Structure formats: structure tokens, C-alpha cells
């Protein structure tokens, strides 16, 4: 079993191809390079995954939102997506 790696591929091309299902994973060289197209595509359902750790780590793709903390107005969708991705990785061993 091997890993097929392609690239480098321009960001304006690779992210659309990844969203269309041409790739299982798209790796960005730095934080903002990866977050911009993902957040534009689907802000609420974007999830960060740290690969290469000895445990599963997912997180929401937004900040802490201290300005709305405790007001009962936060949207839960990002957190639910992060949990669903983590559960899928643990139970199936693959990304959803």
C-alpha cells in the first residue's frame, strides 16, 4: 500500500478539485492558505484535522467567539461537524 502524491498544484485549482472529490486530502503549507478556500466553500461545515499525531484531533475552523460566549446565540453546526469527523476517523479509520 502506497500513497500517491501530486503537486505542487496552484491553490485556485487544487481546492476545487479536492471539493469535487478528486483527492482524499489536500495539504496546505500554512494555515491561511488552506482556510481561505475551505471557509469560502462551506464556513459552517469546515473542520481542521491535524494529521500525524498519535491520536485523533479535530477542531472547528473559527475562533473562540468570546464576544458571544454565554449569550445563547452561538451556532453549534461547526462543533457537530468536528465531532462527526473525529468519530468517523476513530470508528472507520478513514475520513468521511
Segments from the language model and where they lie:
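Glycine-rich phosphate/nucleotide-binding loop
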Residues: 1-96
Amino acid at each position: 500500500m502506497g500513497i500517491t502524491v501530486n503537486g505542487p498544484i496552484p491553490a485556485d485549482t487544487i481546492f476545487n478539485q479536492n471539493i469535487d472529490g478528486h483527492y482524499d486530502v489536500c495539504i496546505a503549507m500554512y494555515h491561511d492558505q488552506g482556510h481561505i478556500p475551505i471557509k469560502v466553500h462551506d464556513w459552517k461545515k469546515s473542520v481542521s484535522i491535524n494529521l500525524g499525531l498519535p491520536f485523533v484531533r479535530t477542531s472547528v475552523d473559527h475562533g473562540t467567539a468570546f464576544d458571544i460566549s454565554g449569550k445563547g446565540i452561538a451556532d453549534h453546526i461547526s462543533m457537530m461537524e468536528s465531532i462527526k469527523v473525529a468519530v468517523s476517523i476513530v470508528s472507520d479509520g478513514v475520513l468521511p
